[in-house]
Every structure is written in C-alpha cells, then in structure tokens.
C-alpha cells in the first residue's frame, strides 16, 4: 500500500458507497436518509466526546479526549515566533485489533 498519492474520500462518497451496499443487499434507503444517519452519528460522537465519554467500537477502535500538556517554547510555523501553548484537550483515536490487522497487515 503506497501513501504517496492517497485518494480523498468525502461524506458524499461514503453515502454513495453505503447506498450501493444497501442496494446490493436488495434493500432500499434513499441517500438523504443515509446522510441523516451519518450526520446524527457524528453529532452523537462529538457530543459524547464533549462530555468526556470514551466511545468504543469493538474491533474498530476507541475515541476519547486526552489532555495535552502545554509548552513554553512552541514555535508558530507561519511566523517562526516562539509562543506559549497552554494545556489543552484533544480528540484521540486508538485503533482496535481488527483495524490494525486490516490496515497494517499485522496479525495479533
């Protein structure tokens, strides 16, 4: 697998792929409803992360919020000036075993 020129997949592409998958299983669901489900999923994900909840999808991975320590000598990449970065929270994703095996070709 080469990472030099990776294709960019958008939400619309995912909606199209899910729609095709559903049709291949002899089901019918309009794309607008698929988009609503995807939007609702991401709103729930964001809302739970804002509440500092850990979100686990077995075999896929875990989303959580972690605290990142601040630094005194961070550098602004655009200006080169030194700035102080305070402690802050970041969203973090930890891939699950099945995802690691599938993406990285690792057998656990």
UniProtKB/Swiss-Prot annotation:
Disulfide linkage:
none
**Does the entry feature the keyword DNA-binding, yes or no?**
yes
- Any one annotated GO CC term: cytosol
Pfam families in the cross-refs? Bac_DNA_binding
Molecular functions per Gene Ontology: DNA binding; structural constituent of chromatin
Supply the alphabetized keyword list: DNA condensation, DNA-binding
Task: Please name the Gene3D superfamilies in this protein's record.
Answer: IHF-like DNA-binding proteins
Q: What is the effect of changing residue 90 to I?
A: In strain: VS102
Determine if Glycoprotein is one of this entry's keywords. no
Q: Name one GO biological process term.
A: chromosome condensation
Q: Which InterPro entries match?
A: Hist_DNA-bd, Histone-like_DNA-bd_CS, IHF-like_DNA-bd_dom_sf
Superkingdom to which the source organism belongs = Bacteria
Q: What does this protein do?
A: Histone-like DNA-binding protein which is capable of wrapping DNA to stabilize it, and thus to prevent its denaturation under extreme environmental conditions.
Family per record: Belongs to the bacterial histone-like protein family.
Which PANTHER family does the record match to this protein? Answer: DNA-BINDING PROTEIN HU, DNA-BINDING PROTEIN HU-BETA
What is the protein named?
Answer: DNA-binding protein HBbu
Q: Which organism is it from?
A: Borrelia garinii subsp. bavariensis (strain ATCC BAA-2496 / DSM 23469 / PBi)
Biological classification of the source: Bacteria, Pseudomonadati, Spirochaetota, Spirochaetia, Spirochaetales
Chain's gene name: hbb
